[in-house]
Amino acid sequence: LLDILFYLRQSITYTDKDLMKMVDKRMTKLKSGQLIVQDFTMKGAVDFLYALKEKGVRIYLASGTDKADVINEAESLGYAAIFDGGIYGSVGDISKYSKKMVLEDIIRENNLKGSEMLVIGDGPVEIKECRKVNGIAIGIASDEVRRYGLNQEKRSRLIKSGAQIIISDFSQTQELVDLIFTKR
């Protein structure tokens, strides 16, 4: 069983209040039809998740954003059900939630070896934690504004963090799925 910890939310440096104002405005535009799901996600991300589901992968979502907000956004965008492994987010107490803790819990609860864990993320923390347990780490070095294309600064950071594969988006879904499931 290959499990995946997948990050759809991109790292954005705003205060929580500013971030939630922006999210609320965008959710209002989504509900009114001014925006569509693809305006919120990286190119090919949702198709990639469904391709993994077809392979029987249990998928988790972990974010540094408050858990209730992550769940609300996933439900509003219509992809919450994809995350059958659970949706994790900040609970306001670092002793009760961290990406490291989420990875450890997933491994323990599913009796996994690290090599059965695939982490896809845009931050050095999740990449480093994945590599510490010998997991497979894919770094997303994306241009967050366009939601596709390569960000060289992120690429360098992710490589230094231990990412084994770097992608800029999920536009090559089938090739990435084939690579992940190639027997070594």
Question: Where do the PLM segments sit?
Answer:
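Helix-loop "lid/cap" segments that line or gate small-molecule binding pockets
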Residues: 1-13
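Short, acidic loop-to-helix structural element flanking the phosphoryl-transfer center
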Residues: 11-12, 16, 20-61, 71, ...
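Substrate-recognition/cap helix-loop segment adjacent to the acidic, metal-dependent catalytic center
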Residues: 36, 46, 50-60, 64-91, ...
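Glycine-rich phosphate-binding loop signature in dinucleotide/nucleotide-binding domains
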Residues: 55-57, 109-116, 180-184
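Short, acidic/turn-prone active-site loops that include or flank metal/cofactor-
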Residues: 87-94, 141-147
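Short acidic-hydrophobic, aromatic-tinged amphipathic segments that line or gate anion-handling sites
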Residues: 88, 164-172
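Conserved Lys-Pro-Asp/Glu-containing loop-to-beta segment of HAD-superfamily phosphomonoesterases
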Residues: 97-131
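Acidic, Mg2+-coordinating phosphoryl-transfer loop and its flanking beta/alpha structural elements
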Residues: 119-165
